[in-house]
Amino acid sequence: MNAEILAVGTELLMGQIANTNAQYISKRLNDIGVNVYYHSVVGDNSVRLKKCLLAALERCDLVIMTGGLGPTQDDLTKETVAEVLGKKLVLHEESLERIKTFFTRINRKMTDNNVKQAYLPEGCTVVENNSGTAPGCIIEDKGKIVVMLPGPPPEMMPMLDDTVIPYLAEKSGYRIVSKYLRVFGIGESQLEEMIMDLVDKQDRVTIATYAKDGQVTVRLTTKARTEEEGFREILPLQNEIASRLKEALYSTEDEELEYVAAKMLIDNNITIATAESCTGGLISARLTDVPGISKVFNRGIVSYSNEAKMENLGVKPETLEKYGAVSSRTAMEMAEGVRKIASTDIGLAVTGIAGPDGGTDEKPVGLVYVALAHSLGTEVRELRLAGNRNRIRNLTVLNAFDMVRRYVMKLKG
């Protein structure tokens, strides 16, 4: 089965919002073995929408449309699909009741134009919307399948996952099963060299690598009738790659690095406190994104100025005077200071120059020090990072979590 994703909305063409739906839908279709051949975007114009839909139906078996299901006059998706397929729009009483219940629940008056959203093409399969008012639908007609879903991602995504994907999976007969191995501390080119012989002889299980935000993902993919069968076929290759990557491999479940590090702290009851300068609280923010972190996360201190480093963390004035705020020695004293103040098992600290200003020949933009203080001593990682301010800060955070992860691994043997 091949597919086209057709996004409807003038706001997409004007660049007011990004079409993140297409990326999400493509990934989910790939998971069940549906090939996505085209992404299209069209504005809120019935003539152009009709042309795009006809073209999509001509070249694909499946068309998934997002947007244009709302209550206003420029929401034209259902009307256009009904016209193209020769279907009538009929009132779906159950959907109307759900819309009324939604407005009652949020304590808002339901306007008359919202009734429009309960009119659906005759004979369709209704896709319930538990997060908004616009129901979606699936229509099968002359060997083609048209799916209509609302545009807002918080509404579209659960509707796709809970109803549309299971519906389509039954028809495909097989699914694409993928395993994602997440790696940090090895570049993409170095990683490829380490597994090139496996890439050269790949067969039923294919290997792909891609880098993003300082991390590398290895995707292992196969086709199978069931997910269990697919994972079973992938496992030998997964184990071989894991044995080569060793501690650089931090997840086989497509998890974020900060989540893995935080879970290791929680599972091993290792308490932590943080001291941040150039990252301005990003480490603390990402820690607190992880459920259960309150068991081990004591506090986070943002010590941006030299005065704050001395007053809040006990960094020595002579250290700052001799070595500067961005130095290995200052990072060490920050980590040791926050660990002592909080009485935690480990203290994590970062200091650096994120730019775009503040760099010198001796200490350029991108120079960062990450320090981890623990019962065995204090270790420091010097980083020379490239990119804009946001990238440098993000890579600093990832390196900090990587230090924590590797420390816990070493501690537990």
From Swiss-Prot:
SUPFAM superfamilies, sorted: CinA-like, Molybdenum cofactor biosynthesis proteins
CDD domains cross-referenced by the UniProt entry: cinA (cd00885)
Database matches in InterPro entries: CinA, CinA-like_C, CinA_C, CinA_KH, Competence-induced_CinA, MoaB/Mog-like_dom_sf, MoaB/Mog_dom
Family from the record: Belongs to the CinA family.
Protein name, as recorded: Putative competence-damage inducible protein
Higher taxonomy: Bacteria, Bacillati, Bacillota, Clostridia, Eubacteriales
Gene name of the encoded protein: cinA
